[in-house]
Amino acid sequence: KASEYWLKQHQAHWLHTEVPMMSDINDWKQNLSSTEKNIIGSILKGFAQTETVVNDYWTGLVTHWFRKPEIIAMATTFGAMETIHAEAYSLLNEELGLDDFSEFLEDETTLAKIENLMDVRDSFGTERNWHEIAKSLAIFSAFTEGVNLFSSFAVLLSFKLQNKLKG
């Protein structure tokens, strides 16, 4: 049932105040090389912006395509969760001294990821062609969750194997 999935979705909810970040902040300040900081900084700056684009997709396009109340509730909840994640990453970026948005615009790798994501989002528009909608959902989900976020999480987890960024 849609309502059961909605409940599970809300039970997975977290706020930045529930995620311990202090040990990672200390690692950043004391244990990471400038190369490691550059890698992690690029990922974190990208996360904050990616979450914003993903929010736009769920709340703008998906809610337009599917007018069923349960799907609208799911999509707006997804969008709301993305704003919470974006806030968490923004606060972490600020704490690490990565809060200058113009730096994000100068980071070619991060900017290219976001531009590709926005191109996928924008290429399908708001028309209700079910084949195009299915294609959009598949590509957008695979790119954002698969290629962009999970590959970045894999890089971050590799630091944990080195006993860094354990939080």
Task: Please give the residue ranges for each predicted region.
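Non-heme di-metal
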Residues: K1-G167
